[in-house]
Amino acid sequence: MDIIRALLDGIAMAAIFNGSAAALVIANPRYLMDSYPKGIQKAAPEPMSKKEKRVNKIFTVIVMGGCWLYGVISTLHGGIHTFKTIFCTAYIHWIIVNFADFFLLDCLLFQKWTKLIVIPGTEDNPIYQTKNWMKVIGIPEHFLLWPFITVPLFSLVQTGIVMLIQLLFLPLR
């Protein structure tokens, strides 16, 4: 396993995901309202509209699909063949996406440039304060949910896709 390649690929995947998420949330915070803490969602004057939910689903499919595609193609191109090394490579990819999300979106964007991402009608919600944001979503999501559940699951899916492609389309080594 090429650790440097896995790290660089993870950084590229993080740039794809976080750049896209930041652009979308700055364009219209309501498009990603379902990713906000429940207290902010409930404080919003109205729930997500059908259009906002549709944009959210399209964004999720395209961006997450693009990240998975990037990870799969890079892993295939890197010539990795065993379950363990493919899984570890995928885990590195997705854990970097996770921590970049935490530092770039939760810490930088949401805490330093809060005015850009506030959902209209929730401006005075105390959850936007750094301490509350980290307690409600930042720490639980990025230091518990993602490292122990989401990243292993995403890594398993990516590993399965890579191994299936290798089995079906690549000659035995």
Q: Where does each model-flagged region fall?
A:
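Membrane-interface helix-loop junction between the first two transmembrane segments
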Residues: 22-44
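Alpha-helical transmembrane segments
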Residues: 2-20, 85-103
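Individual transmembrane alpha-helices with interfacial aromatic-anchor signatures
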Residues: 29, 33, 130-153
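Interfacial helix-start motif at the membrane-water boundary
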Residues: 43-63
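Alpha-helical transmembrane segments of multipass membrane proteins
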Residues: 13-21, 63, 67, 97, ...
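Juxtamembrane boundary at the C-terminal end of a transmembrane helix
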Residues: 157-173
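Juxtamembrane non-transmembrane "cap" segments at the membrane-aqueous interface
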Residues: 106-126
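Core segments of transmembrane alpha-helices
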Residues: 56-73, 140-155
